[in-house]
């Protein structure tokens, strides 16, 4: 199997919202984002798929080492890195942003709680903000401020993921909601770990939803006018996640403890087409 074929298979297996905007891209850009997303999926699998933390750490260290070969003109071992080697020069993808993504996965191995929102934002920057920046580079931009937009929009998407996955993460022993905010709303950790929503938990989650929604608006305002056309695929992803956030809100955000909300594939396609034609309006 060719390296690029491996990446396409990896992405197809994920059934991700990423796929909904791909059809609007050139083949070259579609392939590049496919490779990037396959890289992200592989790292996620290291953290979520290894039950032994020591094995996960060894595997993550191996990914760091193999990534070095991508940027040192050596032949990497993993097919994702082989595909990445082929595209990183074409789109000027910097090594430090891939390293930051691995650093974010390292945080998942080392800590299960975040004291403050500032701590959580660092995590979000590493696992989502830099992905947004890499996607922005692949899509193309003329104004450097577009990278600020991409980082902020990555934060919005990751906050949405965190809200959606509160129950699932709790069952894996993780709570991403900041401790300071849980204390402010008088929500002890056992409420989340035992997946038993309370009125205070509902208020905490409404606060999370409102902040995420405002983050989408702030991110959209950061996108320079001259790059709105080139960044449309990123906006499609944002629109789908924003719709997910609204569904969680309508359903009752406290219910994330008991089940996971998802946007059906046909609706994702409708959102993608609408956003392509009329833009994203959070």
Regions found by a protein language model. Give the residues of each.
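Catalytic cores of Mg2+-dependent Asp-rich isoprenoid enzymes
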Residues: 1-159, 163, 167-282
């Amino acid at each position: 199997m060719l390296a690029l074929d491996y990446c396409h298979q990896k992405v197809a297996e994920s059934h991700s919202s990423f796929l909904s905007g791909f059809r609007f891209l050139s083949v070259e850009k579609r392939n590049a984002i496919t490779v990037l997303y396959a890289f992200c999926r592989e790292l996620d699998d290291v953290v979520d798929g290894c039950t032994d933390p020591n094995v996960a750490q060894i595997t993550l260290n191996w990914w760091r080492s193999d990534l070095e070969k991508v940027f040192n003109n050596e032949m990497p071992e993993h097919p994702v890195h082989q595909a990445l080697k082929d595209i990183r020069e074409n789109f000027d993808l910097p090594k430090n942003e891939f390293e930051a993504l691995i650093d974010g996965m390292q945080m998942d191995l080392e800590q299960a709680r975040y004291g403050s929102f500032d701590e959580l934002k660092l995590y979000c920057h590493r696992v989502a903000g830099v992905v947004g920046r890499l996607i922005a580079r692949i899509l193309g931009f003329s104004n450097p401020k577009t990278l600020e937009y991409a980082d902020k929009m990555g934060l919005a998407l990751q906050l949405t993921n965190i809200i959606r996955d509160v129950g699932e993460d709790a069952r894996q022993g993780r709570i991403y909601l900041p401790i300071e905010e849980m204390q402010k709303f008088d929500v002890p950790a056992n409420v989340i770990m035992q997946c038993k929503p309370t009125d205070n938990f509902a208020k905490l989650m409404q606060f999370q939803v409102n902040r995420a929604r405002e983050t989408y608006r702030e991110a959209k305002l950061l996108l320079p006018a001259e790059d709105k056309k080139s960044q449309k695929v990123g906006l499609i992803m944002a629109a789908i996640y924003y719709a997910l956030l609204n569904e969680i809100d309508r359903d009752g955000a406290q219910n994330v403890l008991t089940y996971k909300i998802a946007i059906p594939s046909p609706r994702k396609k409708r959102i993608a087409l609408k956003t392509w034609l009329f833009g994203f309006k959070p």
